[in-house]
Amino acid sequence: MEELQGYLEMDGFRQQYFLYPFLFQEYIYALAHGHALNGSILYEPVENLDHDNKSSSLIVKRLITRMHQQNRLIISVNDSNQNRFVGHNNHFDSQMISEGFAVVVEIPFSLRLVSSLEEKEIAKSHNLRSIHSIFPFFEDKLSHLNHVSDILIPHPIHLEILVQTLHSWIQDTPSLHLLRLSLYEYWNSNSLITSKNSISLFSKENQRFFLFLSNSHVYECEFIFIFLRKQPFHLRSKSFGSFLERTHFYAKIEYLVVVLCNDFQKTLGLFKDPFMHYVRYQGKSILASRGAHLLIKKWKSHLVNFWQCHFDLWSQPARIHIKQLYNHPFYFLGYLSSVRLNSSVIRSQMLENSFRIDTAIKKFETVVPIIPLIGSLAKAKFCNVSGHPISKPFRADLSDSEILNRFGRICRNLSHYHSGSSKKQSLYRIKYILRLSCARTLSRKHKSTIRAFLKRLGSEFLEEFFTEEEQALSLIFPTTSSPSHRSHRERIWYLDIIRINDLVSHL
């Protein structure tokens, strides 16, 4: 690993990104699996091992030997059968190559990130990794804005577009050829996938490689924001021409170069907004602006044109929803967020004259979307589509304590994740569904009715692990009010949540 980092830190590497030799090193594939090659065993399919117990070290050596045979790595457009490792499991080889490529290509980007943080003297903060850290930002900023665009980043992406995207970062032709080969082999071996050449093809079997491809694609989608925010008002025509070239407007460059700089200033002025904020999580992003409705519509039109021309795909305008914050809430990270106007009347009196002052205070609110969450619980077999609790099917060998722990963990996680809700009624209903579903599951296991089961064990049987959240709140807010009343009012954002809740992710 130190040898690899030493080579990557060389100035020549930073200019050329020559990654191809590392794909022929065994330790790269060991890093891909997170252990040494003599550790956990990685087996090929039985038909390729001749029923012998071969370790992953031998498998990697065989793969590297096949990769050295350049005549079998030639990509042919006319005959797809030539794009194969002849006589071997193509799917398995392509998967291993993609895993190794993900390890190699991540290192230069991580080094670039570390150097960028050091240059800007940005201190690392683990609290900023929390998903909940986004909502205090919303509370501070969105109450002063007018419009929000709910954006879904376009997908699926053709495999060739992904290779071209990486080509703009990595000037290493052999590595890109090998990556292209493994991508198409991976796709050809998945005949059950209906969305051909889709980036979602690798989401289950090779998550590390999928995350790298998806992040590179999202970075390209966000390139327009980075460009426009960095440019001043007096933009040169040369800079704007290079931007257009990147978005593949080749036919328009010759005409636009001769346009006066004032026209570019007017064009950029349409998108210049000092009160614009952008937030993204996975494939969904929020673009909020204080400007007029016309400005946000121009952003929508520009984004659609940019994605269509840059990625050669049809980007539906319906994937970008423009909403007014005062009238329409937007869904993000499992919350329905909105800005509500709280009006209040103040009576003032000066000498013998009295008058009233009507004031409106903007308040950012987040609530739990009860209907989508019930639908997610119904998919997980906790209730039906109407929200009526049902018994959850479990293995017969599970003990009562194990079933209780599972239900309790799910309930606590949901309470923990949705602790920032302004109104807790929806969350209490979800707790009720889980509590009654747990009781139905246990009574079904003991072949009894719910009433007889709870009567035998007492109503306090399900109270202990469902009230741990309120007990935790009593430690955070040690006041005289009761924990249940306090939890109904307080909105809490935890800084230890690094991923979205599983049930919320189904929405």
Curated annotation (Swiss-Prot):
Principal location listed in the UniProt entry: plastid
**GO MF term list:** RNA binding
Question: Could you state one GO cellular component term attached to this entry?
Answer: chloroplast
Give me any GO biological process, just one.
tRNA processing
Query: Which InterPro entries does the annotation name?
Result: Domain_X, Maturase_MatK, Maturase_MatK_N
**Where does the record place a coiled coil?**
none
Q: Give the keywords, sorted.
A: Chloroplast, mRNA processing, Plastid, RNA-binding, tRNA processing
Asked whether the keyword Transcription regulation is assigned, the reply is: no
Query: What compartments host this protein?
Result: Plastid, Chloroplast
Q: Which Pfam families match?
A: Intron_maturas2, MatK_N
Briefly state the protein's biological role: Usually encoded in the trnK tRNA gene intron. Probably assists in splicing its own and other chloroplast group II introns.
So what family is this one in? Belongs to the intron maturase 2 family. MatK subfamily.
- State what protein this is by name: Maturase K
